[in-house]
Amino acid sequence: MAKEKFDRSKPHLNVGTIGHVDHGKTTLTAAITTTLAKAIGGKNKAVAYDQIDNAPEEKARGITIATSHQEYETANRHYAHVDCPGHADYVKNMITGAAQMDAAILVVSATDGPMPQTKEHILLARQVGVPYVIVFINKADMLAADERAEMIEMVEMDVRELLNKYSFPGDTTPIVHGSAVKALEGDESEIGMPAILKLMEALDTFVPNPKRVIDKPFLMPVEDVFSITGRGTVATGRVEQGVLKVNDEVEIIGIRPTTKTVVTGIEMFRKLLDQAEAGDNIGALLRGTKKEEIERGQVLAKPGSITPHKKFAAEVYVLTKDEGGRHTPFINNYRPQFYFRTTDVTGVCNLPNGVEMVMPGDNVSLTVELISPIAMDKGLKFAIREGGRTIGSGVVAEITE
């Protein structure tokens, strides 16, 4: 059977459910697919809880993560939805960016209110740069009808306070309450299917269409450099974001002092291009640049769009022994290599006050100082390597210098 072509007529967004264990994240995912299949039909297919729960394992940057991907659509948009079974899987997924989320649905039980992982997931969402969070207060059916409104109001206040604490707009965040279980059963009272449709409406209206990589400023990590006699120096790599046109000025950033040059030609598969865009593997001919003035690990970028830095705060997940990581903990002043885009740079890790050591399997906030600067922005992902093997994965949470 021929593969169905992906329909691009609707804007596409990546969303994920986050929240404390047993607050109903997977049930909500099942309820969304089931409710939309009934209410809208179209391409929506109901997916049962147990189909989502036995999530296939995938490897992202060498780390095994169990994630379940579902898809559904509203009248306005197509969504890819990721749900992870275990708390550790959420941490790894968010830090490695295995599924980059354009928005997260935070699930909070009406009977418990915010719990430790609720906080941890909100903090992680903030640290790794999830731009929007909306909230579903679940298990409303577990509250006595006469107490329901009052209890939900209290939980809602707590959640808004938490969101504000971690710099999300807690006062304006849409919060919908209902029961994922009731919706799954086809219940048509306000806490059943209508609550799910209300949540979808909040997702459609509160979260704007994301800027896609093509709209962002041009950036290409340099993979290789060679010189063509009589033509000059060519830098090759895959365009990470944006568009590059012939005669555009670019900066060469990272490792050494920043320089400027002009792209006088673009080739792909030995054909000349007028312009290259995100996803293209190209060779860029650089005016007046000598082969020894540019190296793998630098980036070509639109002037002024990104700067080189050495010091940053990071959110890091350290692999367990079983995942191929270290067998022993590391301590302050640990000096591994940090792999950014196309190259390793040595850096020194400083642990937070009161943390003596970091064990395999931990996730930890630490500060890093690299020996040479790398073009970076908040949200940039990296791997931590030692002797050529990956021992951790991280994301730049804050640039300090």
UniProtKB/Swiss-Prot annotation:
EC code(s) of this entry: 3.6.5.3
Region (G4): 138-141
Residue sites binding Mg(2+) per the record: 26
Keywords, sorted A to Z: Cytoplasm, Elongation factor, GTP-binding, Hydrolase, Magnesium, Metal-binding, Nucleotide-binding, Protein biosynthesis
Entry keyword ATP-binding: no
GO molecular function, one term: translation elongation factor activity
GO cellular component: cytosol
Region span, G1: 19-26
Region (G3): 83-86
Location in or out of the cell: Cytoplasm
InterPro entries in the cross-refs: EF-Tu_GTP-bd (IPR041709), EF-Tu_GTPase (IPR050055), EFTu-like_2 (IPR004161), EFTU_2 (IPR033720), G_TR_CS (IPR031157), P-loop_NTPase (IPR027417), Small_GTP-bd (IPR005225), T_Tr_GTP-bd_dom (IPR000795)
Region (G5), start-end ranges: 179-181
Record's function text: GTP hydrolase that promotes the GTP-dependent binding of aminoacyl-tRNA to the A-site of ribosomes during protein biosynthesis.
Family: Belongs to the TRAFAC class translation factor GTPase superfamily. Classic translation factor GTPase family. EF-Tu/EF-1A subfamily.
UniProt protein name: Elongation factor Tu
Gene (UniProt): tuf
